[in-house]
């Protein structure tokens, strides 16, 4: 799963209270709730993640999940987009609906004094969404305009092409925005069917944070959501990453080459190997001082930035990277990426590289979890991956104790990273 963003920052002090997990029964469904109370500021947020409500489930209606979420942002049928937005703004309430690859996500942010009203607005939206022809046509127009803009977004095109090469003939190869043809075919009945499919309580995960009394907040949520059916739990499909080492080039009117690349990264046990994968990818291509950055940018001057990172979700495990270079150095840059990765897999890293990686990761990881929003984001991600909620401390301990032999044995065991696929946006007339 891709991870959700909670924008509300409710404090910069660490460790005031660890995030915790409980369950709330709503209409006889046992809904997991991740929460953390923090009373520094009189603010709160509620995040609802409906598993299976993302673009992965679009099937032959590409763009439906995204369009559905955007129509939900058009307010209620009674008030419309403007009237509903004004009602929220009067009390400084923020209510936003979005999708990721796997989930539909509703984020509600509010001042403590308006918590009850915020949850009431949420209930009104779900009870009577603005499923009207006017709202549908408005969102269709917005999405078609976005698709038109994407035609000249070379990063988007290269990234989408890489997905299509790595996950050919699977839902992961599809564009979340859909196509012009698929968007135009979506009807009001499709939105109503999507609502019934997505909003089931057994697919729901709740995240709460801020100046809340959790028991009271959950009672209010129960009242807002208990009209939804139990439904069935979401079962994630898993997709293998291509190891065909293909190279796909799209020719456009561009002055630069946009190079995206990826490969399988077969991790069987995240609890044992997540720390090693973090160290491995940091040294290979995680920033300044990494192998890719030092050789491609510093020594060769071929790109301003280059990286590679791991991507672990319940639906796929793979590594992916990116660089942008001159058209004249495109071929050389691609060859150099292959060479650097191959040498790294064969020989591993040095003790100095391991020490530097430990210093950076052990110093930066705690900073990434110093706000309540970032802590809950991390906790939700661990919950999603099936890891303990407090896995962050385990991760830091594993990094601290990691030996050079341990990390190099791990690196040398993952020869599949050599099976790189490239997706490139270039210019046929100028790439020589």
Curated annotation (Swiss-Prot):
Residues 1-20 form the signal peptide. Keywords: Secreted, Signal. It is found in: Secreted. One of its GO terms (molecular function) is metal ion binding. Gene3D superfamilies: Metalloenzyme, LuxS/M16 peptidase-like. GO terms for cellular component: extracellular region. May contribute to the full activity of the protease PqqE. This is Non-peptidase homolog YmxG. It comes from Helicobacter pylori (strain ATCC 700392 / 26695). The lineage of its organism: Bacteria, Pseudomonadati, Campylobacterota, Epsilonproteobacteria, Campylobacterales.
